[in-house]
Amino acid sequence: MSSAPPFAAALAWSGHLRRRLDAHPDLAAWLANACAHPVSANVLAAWQAELSGPDAPEVLPVEQCRGMLRKLRERVFLTLIVRDLGGQADLEEVVGAMTVLADIAVGTAYRSVAAELAAVHGLPREQSTGDPQEMLIVGMGKLGGRELNVSSDIDLVMLYGDEGETDGPRRISNHEFYGRLTRRMMPVLSEVDADGQVFRTDLRLRPDGDAGPLAWSLDALEHYLIGQGREWERYAWLKARLMPAQAFADSNPDAQARQLESLRVPFVYRKYFDFDALAALRALRERIRQDWQRRALARNGVDSANNIKLGDGGIREIEFIVQLSQLIRGGRMPALQRRGLLEALHAERAAGLVPEGDAQKLEAAYRFLRRTEHALQYREDEQTHLLPADPAQRAALAAALGYEPAAFERTLAEHRAFVSQTFRNAFRLAGMGEEDDSPAPARTPANGHGMRPHAGALHDIEERLAGQIQRDFPEHAEDLLRRTETLLGSHRVRSLPDSSRHRLEALLPAALTAAAQTSAPMDAALRLFDLIETIAQRSAYLALLAEYPDTLARVARMVAASPWAAQYLTQHPLLLDSLIDWRTLFEPLDFAQVARQLAADLDACRLPDGEPDIERQMNLMRDVQRQASFQLLAQDLEGELTVEKLADQLSALADLLLAETIRRVWPLVNRRPGAEPHLAVIAYGKLGGKELGYASDLDLVFLFDDDREDAAELYAKLGRRMTSWLSTMTSSGRLYEVDLRLRPDGDAGLLAVSLEAFEQYQRSHAWPWEHQALTRARYAAGDTEAGARFERIRADILVMPRDVQALRGEVLGMRDKISAGHPNRSELFDVKHDRGGMVDVEFVTQYLVLCHAATHRVLVNNLGNIALLRLAGEAGLIPAPLALAAGDAYRTLRRAQHQLRLKGVDKARVPPGQLAAERATVCELWQTVLQDGTIAQAEVK
């Protein structure tokens, strides 16, 4: 037996290693050499070839396969003992080597057994193509996540594509062929003989467990997952990975692989989070807390605190913490759809779902516990997770891991305490609100007999609501009773299943109570009923509002404050669950984080063949825009944002989404590898002036700076695809309406224009109103050099010499056209379009810029109307007090327009006495600058 330094720690701890070296003295020299290198996939492939023999056939006979795999497993296990305990191998090497071993073992055993069966029965064939059909072997759990421990079971699910039969002389159905294959394959891996075993195998994660067939068709799996799939199965399928196993020449399982992934992803990761699932996940957490194995261990006299997998603060609790966020958020955040635990934890940290410090502590705990788990298993090659109770053995374990006994115990206790506390708070950490030591939300009792409630049940709830309405809404009782009757009589409600109806019956009284406590009870009640009727067919949202009273109260406050907000929520109920964690809605939008996470999520939207899933990407961008806008809306309604700050934020969000759109669309139109887009997206109008509202269109112009011969065609195509990407109505709605009419020559012009052509047009052919529009234009997204060049061109155009009298006539004429296009025949004051309104301020500002930018270059900057008026006043172009008063008036008019929009008013009009002072100030500004014109003329030489 060797006692060389690389072996010292391993020999001191592992009785299994000592016995193997005693029995095979020549093994020491081989092991010393093997331990000098990481146990990589290439190393395992070389060992496999060596153990198979130089003349081995491509497919080994079953008995030869059995022996080779057991010897390969011993090589891997012994090498890892020495490298791991000697501090040479990190966790990634250990679990990676065991996973590669499992992939080799399963693939090799499959080929050997399949060849033996095919020799008798022929090949199973695909019905559609006649090609040989492979069995799909799915690795579950740690095998799927590529994180096997050194003495792990492997969980497998066996699947196949088409039903049919084999093509040999003794034909059997494909179903029977794969069942026999599975039955014969398992002993090759798991049977213990003189050489040991390769892996214990477990097939119980297949549909119906031990009661189900050994191999399932994909169609049968689909029916099972849709009809019977449970929450713990979502948890199980999260890590599921198709293993690299191919037995038949000329087979092509790619289509079946794509079909499998198209089943797995929506089953595990749901876009619309199901709050039934939330209750099931809570139950799963309790099952982990009170696992029957812990109780069994306690009954056997073993202290369950010594179990580092199942005990408090153990490995399974870390897995639950990480996977809970994946299950809750992964449907909307594809970047979280990772099989490996540490990969997923890193993605959650990057997404801001787990604080940096917590993520680091969880990772440190996981690495410590996994390394300890492996050390326990190295000792006697046993699948154990129990720490030794004997102090001497415990000290030996600490030494094997490189710790003094006291330091080991302290580190272990610190890690487990942190994991245990985090596990108890797992749902709060995942953004689902509740402190997890508090009781779960009360669940609505189910109808005991399971029958659909009869008309009497409808009558009962209507009577109960009538009494509540008469008490809490006496002045509007008649109207609200009529709305209640239409709601309960609607087809959506009458066709509800029992569980949803019971939720509705619990929700409606709670909704009335919440509405009664708002500033506008009747409005809130009617809008809540509209929302409830819209979401009635989605039991998840009924559950959310019925079981989270704080969330219902928040919804009531929002819809009471703004009918526009009520309509927005009704159109996008996906946003409701963001109200659970109210605090996060009031955090400032971190646009850098939004951009990083959006890019990561879009990158993860892939079809099974690796190509981008464009439909998912488009929907995801719409969902992100809705979520960010809703966050701003919540802050807006609570008075946390000024109108200017809100517009800045909405404009920054649009810029971000435009930039991401270029990145996603460019590869779809460009055919030159490595070429970058030299496109600048120029924002005009509200986006250009950073005055965007919640539902504003985007006025855009596409400019390019590229000398390639196909540039005009390429960038026109890019512009078309971008416009489609932004404005197409998908299942998640439309991102933005896009207006391209401000480009040179308008609708008659090219969709994308070179910067040279744009400059020439602006100098020689543009109308004065186009120069007015240019005062509010800015580079918004795309190539920064092209954007900078546009800004230089814009500045040059704005400082061109102009005939002031002619310009004044053009501006006045254009203002008259605007008025004619927005006639107001009412007695009300139109805040935007009437004389003394916002348009007057904007026209005056544009006129001042075009007249005076040449002599006052500060006016070239696109700073917004209020700032530009102030600068004009400071420069003496208009009286400074008037400039400040007009800026204040414009701010007030914008605020009034915004409040009216939130109230759902299409046209921002107010009684003539309202805003009279502001209107008078704007009229004075207009008269001073454009009617008298004296100041402007005096300043222009």
Curated annotation (Swiss-Prot):
EC number: 2.7.7.89, 2.7.7.42
A GO cellular component annotation in the UniProt record: cytosol
Source organism, top-level taxon: Bacteria
Keyword match Cell cycle: no
Enzyme class (EC, first level): transferase
Signal sequence, start to end: none
GO molecular function: [glutamate-ammonia-ligase] adenylyltransferase activity; [glutamine synthetase]-adenylyl-L-tyrosine phosphorylase activity; ATP binding; magnesium ion binding
Catalytic reaction annotation: [glutamine synthetase]-O(4)-(5'-adenylyl)-L-tyrosine + phosphate = [glutamine synthetase]-L-tyrosine + ADP; [glutamine synthetase]-L-tyrosine + ATP = [glutamine synthetase]-O(4)-(5'-adenylyl)-L-tyrosine + diphosphate
Biological process per Gene Ontology, one example term: regulation of glutamine family amino acid metabolic process
Residue segments, region Adenylyl removase: 1-431
Cofactors: Mg(2+)
Keyword presence, Protein transport: no
Gene3D superfamilies assigned to the protein according to its UniProt record, in alphabetical order: 1.20.120.1510, Beta Polymerase, domain 2, Nucleotidyltransferases domain 2
InterPro entries for the chain: GlnE (IPR023057), GlnE_rpt_dom (IPR005190), NT_sf (IPR043519), PII_UdlTrfase/GS_AdlTrfase (IPR013546)
Keywords from the named record: ATP-binding, Magnesium, Multifunctional enzyme, Nucleotide-binding, Nucleotidyltransferase, Transferase
Region (Adenylyl transferase): 447-941
Role noted for this protein: Involved in the regulation of glutamine synthetase GlnA, a key enzyme in the process to assimilate ammonia. When cellular nitrogen levels are high, the C-terminal adenylyl transferase (AT) inactivates GlnA by covalent transfer of an adenylyl group from ATP to specific tyrosine residue of GlnA, thus reducing its activity. Conversely, when nitrogen levels are low, the N-terminal adenylyl removase (AR) activates GlnA by removing the adenylyl group by phosphorolysis, increasing its activity.
Xref: NCBIfam families: PRK11072.1
Similarity field: Belongs to the GlnE family.
Protein name (database record): Bifunctional glutamine synthetase adenylyltransferase/adenylyl-removing enzyme
